[in-house]
Regions:
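Glycine-rich oxoanion-binding loops at beta->alpha junctions
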Residues: 62-63, 68-78
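Hydrophobic helix-and-loop "lid/oligomerization" segment in the mid-to-C-terminal part
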Residues: 2-29, 37-65, 83-88, 169-351
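Short acidic-hydrophobic, aromatic-tinged amphipathic segments that line or gate anion-handling sites
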Residues: 4, 74-79, 130-134
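Short, structured coil segments at secondary-structure junctions
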Residues: 70-72, 109, 125-126, 294
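Active-site cofactor/cluster-binding pocket
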Residues: 78-128
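Short alpha-helices
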Residues: 116-183
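Short amphipathic alpha-helical segments
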Residues: 38, 68, 102-105, 127-128, ...
Length: 351
């Protein structure tokens, strides 16, 4: 199928892969379960076809520990350490070159480029560009491609099912569609174990993560009649609780799960002088447009951004955008209340 944002089909990409020998595969910076699952599924599949394949990480940052069960994860190479030439660079779950970070240099050296993604994007970075925003996950697309290549297998199935389960919130988010259930069934038939994914990823929270949750809940700020909730974490929170950044990944979904909330936002200092923002929507509200206002992006119901000023500034500017965009009828009064509240927290935020 040729989607509106594509210039090719998965069938054509399969034929192109069959005609080439050396590949590099990379996903976006701060890779999540879908990004890693899709990339590793493709890596295992192409290697089963006799191809020479290297899986890359966009930066040297460690990946989420809870994904350590994924086969082949330990062999991923930080892109800055990879200096060889490859014929084909496959970008998976990446809407633009900026999100490749260090891997952009490998992308530029490659002779040919393929993009496989489910993020809507206004730009294209590949000669073969397949983008399907209707797909629940990049792993759904990777699995479809592997079927076309006749390159499915147990490892591929586990990686793909991990991506599908994590990006759909165990089949509970708005992006769920009939196809992801079909693919899930196929991966289980191929040897994937849903209980393994559930145990290792969804049922293995650390004590530091729970302590961060306590802090986040104590700082919740509700606006627009409880339809918008915002909270934050500071660098010192991670230090004092002995937590790593991955320990905070689940927290945005806890905010989203509060009764009456339509939009949730958490802002976290990332240890690099930046603020990482995560946005979630529980209805048809489009939070991706808010993320794009700050140079980020994502999906309609789940998006992220990086903010380059102080946490105090972020706690005014980003929630203001949310209120004005999603709740215009309440904007003037609620933005004024927000500004008063954040001014009262200045000393704590600057500490």
């Amino acid at each position: 199928m040729l989607t509106p944002q594509s210039n090719t089909t998965l069938e054509e990409i399969a034929r192109f892969i069959e005609a080439h020998d050396t590949f590099a595969i990379c996903g976006h910076v701060n890779p999540d379960g879908d990004c890693l699952g899709a990339g590793l599924a493709l890596e295992h599949g192409l290697r089963a076809l006799g191809k020479q394949v290297v899986g890359l990480l966009a930066t040297e940052d460690p990946v989420e520990e809870k994904l350590g069960f994924l086969p082949g994860l330990e062999n991923l190479v930080p892109a800055k350490d990879f200096t060889d030439e490859v014929e084909v660079f496959i970008a998976i779950d990446v809407p633009n070159v900026d999100r490749l970070k260090d891997a952009a240099a490998v992308h530029d050296r490659a002779k040919h480029h393929i993009t496989i993604d489910h993020h809507a994007s206004e730009t294209s970075m590949a000669e073969l560009n397949y983008v399907d925003p209707a797909s629940a996950s990049a792993s759904d697309l990777a699995w479809e491609l592997l079927k076309l290549l006749n390159a499915t297998g147990k490892d591929q199935a586990l990686c793909a099912l991990t991506g599908i389960m994590t990006d759909t919130g165990r089949f509970s988010y708005q992006n769920v569609n009939p196809t992801c259930f079909i693919h899930a069934a196929e991966t289980v038939e191929a040897g994937a174990e849903p209980n393994l994914i559930a145990r290792e990823f969804f049922q293995s929270r650390s004590l530091p993560s729970l302590r961060l949750e306590q802090l986040m809940l104590s700082r919740m700020m509700f606006f627009c009649g409880g339809a918008f909730v915002c909270s934050y974490l500071k660098d010192t929170d991670f230090e004092k609780q002995g937590a790593i950044r991955d320990d905070a990944e689940i927290l945005i979904d806890i905010l989203r799960g509060i009764a009456g909330v339509r939009v949730a936002l958490i802002l976290k200092e990332n240890g690099k002088g930046e603020i990482r923002g995560s946005l979630r929507a529980k209805d048809e509200t489009d939070v991706a447009q808010i993320a794009r206002d700050f140079g980020g992006g994502g999906h309609k119901a789940a998006a992220g951004l990086i903010y380059h000023k102080s946490l105090a500034d972020a706690l005014i500017e980003v929630p203001t955008d949310v209120i004005e965009t999603c709740f215009p009828e309440d904007a003037e009064a609620e933005v004024e209340r927000l500004c008063i509240l954040i001014r009262s927290l200045r000393e704590e935020l600057d500490d």
